[in-house]
Amino acid sequence: MRSVVLAAALAAGSAAYPAATPAQGDADAIGWLRAIYRATERLSYTGTFVYQHGEQVETSRITRIVDGSGVHERLEALDGTPREIVRVNEEVKCYLPQTMTLKIDRQLDTRPFPAMRADASELADRYAIRKGETERIAGYDCQAIVLEPRDNLRYGHKLWADLKTGMLVKAKTLNEKNEVVEQFAFTQLQIGGKIEKDQVKSRFAGKGRDWRIETAGVVAVDLTSLGWLLKSLPPGYRKVTEMRRSVGTRADVGHIVVSDGLAAVSVFIEPLSGQVRQGPGGLSRQGAVNVYTRTVDDHLVTVVGEVPAESVRLIADALEHRRP
């Protein structure tokens, strides 16, 4: 059954997209992708951005400092439910003042594109990559980079990077009809320069309030040794990270990250219990994010990603459990 679905998806992809010359892409455009990746890792910046998914629009302020002690970030929602996220290297703290909840987590893989390695040209196997127009955004002259998918198993993307630094200033995610399903754009931005450390400190920490603390334990683990295997992933996707998460009294949750080098998909594996019950399963969607759930050997499997519905379903179907 899985091979039939995969063949149908590939056939649909061939019909939906014009044939492209294989793998070469635009060398200059690929160079821009490398510049964006390097800039995201090394630059300090502060600014306000707007994020839109579906009909929801959110405005946030972010500050990031990269120095000799590592990476320090603070993200604050400026509308909607108050929330603040503070990151120091791998540790991430999420403050939810309305419920007086502090969630503490670890981010084992902090790269912006989880599977991207030194050779960004591998993306050209999965996307037709070209340079677009130049445009002024948030006071910066930016170069547009267009990534058109070569099949129906991934969304298209359009990225705008600052001409001088490579900083990603705007991004759009586009479906198979070339409709925008998700986008973000800075409306005010300072790249580099003097950014005070106080700007990456929580405004809630150390004020003596009684926060309810939820700490997630995150440990890198080989889930294959526990019998969980990903077989026959969709073309271009591969496993890049796997870990085990624990929160409070709930059973540990397995977490696998799958990526095609640009889009990331999370696979969560959680034992069914009184707290975790089997639902109807199947597909749901919010903006560019598709979610697919199924049960495998008394476990609830949830696959979440900014990829087409067919991709999350194929990734969910690829998961098998063999009792050790």
Give the residues covered by each predicted segment.
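N-terminal leader/targeting segments and the immediate start of mature chains
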Residues: 2-7, 11-71, 79-80, 122-128, ...
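Short, solvent-exposed recognition patches
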Residues: 101, 209-299, 307-314
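A generic structural motif
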Residues: 108, 148, 174-175, 246, ...
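Gly/Pro-enriched, hydrophobic low-complexity segments
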Residues: 136-207, 283
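Short, solvent-exposed coil/turn segments at beta-strand boundaries
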Residues: 40-42, 64-72, 86-91, 140, ...
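Short, hydrophobic/aromatic-rich segments at coil-to-beta transitions
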Residues: 42-48, 69-74, 139-146, 167-170, ...
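Intrinsically disordered, low-complexity linker/loop segments enriched in Gly/Pro
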Residues: 108-157
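An acidic-aromatic
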Residues: 58-59, 63-115, 170-193, 303
